[in-house]
C-alpha cells in the first residue's frame, strides 16, 4: 500500500481527499494517474463554485484518454492548483502533494464516512 497514504479518504472514482480543519484538499490517486499515463491537461473548476458529493467538476486529459473528475465531498471551491495549468505533469510526479487539484470548504463533513479508507481503496484497486 505504498501508493495509498493512510491519512486520506478515497472515492471509487479514484479521487482522494485530505481534511485539514474544515478544508478538504482533493486530487487523483497514484493508481488513477498510473492508469491515465502522462497527463497533458487539467480542466479546473471556478473558485467559488458549489459542488455536491460525486458531482463532476473537471477533466484530466492524458496522452491515452480523457477522464472526468468527481468531487469526493460537498463544499465550495476556495482554491484551485493553478500550477497544473502550465505543469499538468505534477499529477504524475506527485499526485498526493504538488499535484493536488482543488481545495474545498466542506459543507457536510459527515459525507466523508461514505468514502473508502486506505485499506479498502487498496483492495478496490486490486479487484480489477
Curated annotation (Swiss-Prot):
Residue positions, PTM N6-lipoyllysine: 64
A Pfam short name: GCV_H
Taxonomic superkingdom: Bacteria
UniProt record, GO biological process: glycine decarboxylation via glycine cleavage system
Keywords assigned by UniProt, alphabetized: Lipoyl
Domain (Lipoyl-binding) ranges: 23-105
Keyword Protein biosynthesis in annotation: no
Cofactor: binding details: Binds 1 lipoyl cofactor covalently.
GO cellular component, one term: glycine cleavage complex
InterPro entries named in the record: 2-oxoA_DH_lipoyl-BS, Biotin_lipoyl, GCV_H, GCV_H/Fam206, GCV_H_sub, Single_hybrid_motif
Annotated PROSITE patterns: BIOTINYL_LIPOYL, LIPOYL
Keyword field contains Signal: no
Disulphide linkage map: none
Cofactor(s) essential for the protein: (R)-lipoate
Oligomer status and interactors: The glycine cleavage system is composed of four proteins: P, T, L and H.
UniProt function note: The glycine cleavage system catalyzes the degradation of glycine. The H protein shuttles the methylamine group of glycine from the P protein to the T protein.
NCBIfam families the record matches: gcvH, PRK01202.1
Family under the similarity heading: Belongs to the GcvH family.
The protein's name in its UniProt record: Glycine cleavage system H protein
Gene this protein is translated from: gcvH
